[in-house]
């Protein structure tokens, strides 16, 4: 079928007439993707309304900004890719919170807690990889790249934890705000204990989402290789080792959101209280 493709009725195909002779290019497969994208946008707008619209705007801005930085790296290879992705990580977090709450209402606690969690997990992961000399990691699936594939993989580690970390930070800090608002007399110990209970519920589910999101992309290849007689351990190393590392790095980022959220919440609360005291004096 690779040399003589078989078509069914109602299949859409792409043709080329540049040589004044119609030639088959490939099947047109983007129709289903378009339907899914439109359905997703419609659901977001229908369920979340105005906030959903601004969330989509934030996603669009983040995608455009990422492509812009990658274009810069493509035009000038002397600029370090990891530096560009580090800049993108910070800006993407600010854009995400800004489109949700408005640029004038950006919550510095959430921004700083997310940045702290993502970069801390990234540094721990990269240091561990360096100490172990990347043992057990198989880069075969990305060796076709025309640039240092390890650098590209490290960049993907940094990007992988942004969304999940930001979600967890928003949930924890917003919950703590509600607790303080409804129970002003609550002390720090009780606040932290309540925050831990909230975090324990959200963190596990976030890590599970991250796990299945990463592993699902490699599962078809994993099954295909096993069906063709490959050894299970060898197949696992080749197709899942990098995904497992991404899950671990993202999982660490999610876990670090718990102490970082408490840290910046209590720090800003203390600064706010101190500011009010100074005003009274």
Predicted stretch roles:
Residues 161-179:
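Short helical (or helix-break) motifs at transmembrane helix termini and adjacent helical loops
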Residues 39, 50-143, 147-160:
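Transmembrane alpha-helical segments that form the functional core of multipass membrane systems
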Residues 62, 116-121, 154, 158, ...:
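Hydrophobic alpha-helical transmembrane segments of multipass membrane transporters and ion channels
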Residues 167, 185-222:
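Pore- and gate-forming transmembrane helices of large, multi-pass membrane proteins
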Residues 15-25, 40-52, 71-79, 178:
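Short juxtamembrane and helix-loop transition motifs at transmembrane-helix boundaries
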Residues 2-31:
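Extended, hydrophilic extramembrane loops/domains of integral membrane proteins
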Residues 104, 179-189:
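Juxtamembrane helix-boundary/capping and inter-helix hinge elements in multi-pass membrane proteins
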Residues 46, 201, 213-281:
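Hydrophobic alpha-helical transmembrane segments of membrane transport and translocation systems
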